[in-house]
């Protein structure tokens, strides 16, 4: 089990995309960067690149500016430069198959139809890429493309900061400990959202069979 030294947050660049569900990976990546010690921010590998330290370890954050479907271009450039290895990165992205308020970490697997992750898998030539999926749920009365490219609704906004904080902490746990998936088990983090109150949500970590 390799520890993680690069967090890659997926999304689309531009102000019009900043508040959309599809950009939740960007939000988590920025939250991770805010938790690093002595961060340095620059432009590299077709995106924003942040170097820093966490728990005594060097860790970097990459926010690709290539648009979602070409996220692999940014990751492949970092791999070619020797700045990361596929098995030691954690890709953070939105997931339609998980309800809002739930995140799930896995060590490897297919893309599940997510074009950003598929671009990365194609670019590095392997599916053994750790990933952290952040649930956005499926639309009830809208096309999927319109839904992911739309802003968060009012109810989601109430719990969004809790979700982002929890996902950032989960990513940094992977920096400390690696992505802990044993045999055929899935690491799932359920969030008890603190809606209508000011209390923090509690994290419940459960290992579930696939």
Which residues does each PLM region occupy?
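Short glycine-enriched, charge-decorated loop/helix-capping segments at active-site entrances
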Residues: 104-110, 148-153
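Surface-exposed flexible segments
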Residues: 78, 206-207
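Residues in and immediately flanking transmembrane alpha helices
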Residues: 107, 196-201
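Alpha-helix boundary/capping motif
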Residues: 186-191, 199, 203, 210
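Nucleotide and nucleotide-moiety/phosphate-recognizing core
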Residues: 2-108, 117-133, 139-143, 158-165, ...
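Intrinsically disordered, low-complexity regions enriched in serine, threonine, proline
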Residues: 181, 192-197
């Amino acid at each position: 089990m390799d520890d993680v030294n690069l967090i890659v947050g997926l999304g689309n660049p531009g102000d019009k995309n900043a508040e959309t569900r599809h950009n939740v990976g960007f939000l988590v990546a920025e939250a991770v960067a805010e938790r690093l010690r002595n961060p340095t921010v620059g432009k590299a590998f077709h995106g924003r690149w942040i170097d820093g330290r966490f728990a005594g370890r060097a860790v970097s954050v990459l926010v690709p500016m290539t648009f979602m479907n070409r996220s692999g271009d940014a990751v492949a450039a970092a791999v070619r430069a020797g700045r990361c290895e596929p098995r030691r990165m954690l890709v953070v992205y939105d997931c339609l198959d998980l309800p809002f308020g739930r995140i799930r970490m896995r060590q490897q697997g297919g893309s599940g139809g997510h074009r950003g992750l598929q671009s990365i898998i194609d670019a590095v030539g392997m599916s053994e890429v750790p990933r952290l999926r952040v649930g956005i749920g499926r639309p009830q009365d809208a096309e999927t493309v319109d839904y992911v490219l739309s802003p968060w609704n009012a109810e989601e906004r109430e719990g969004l900061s809790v979700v982002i904080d929890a996902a950032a902490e989960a990513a940094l746990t992977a920096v400390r400990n690696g992505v802990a998936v044993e045999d055929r088990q899935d690491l799932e983090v359920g969030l008890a959202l603190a809606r209508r109150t000011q209390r923090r949500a509690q994290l419940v970590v459960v290992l579930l069979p696939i």
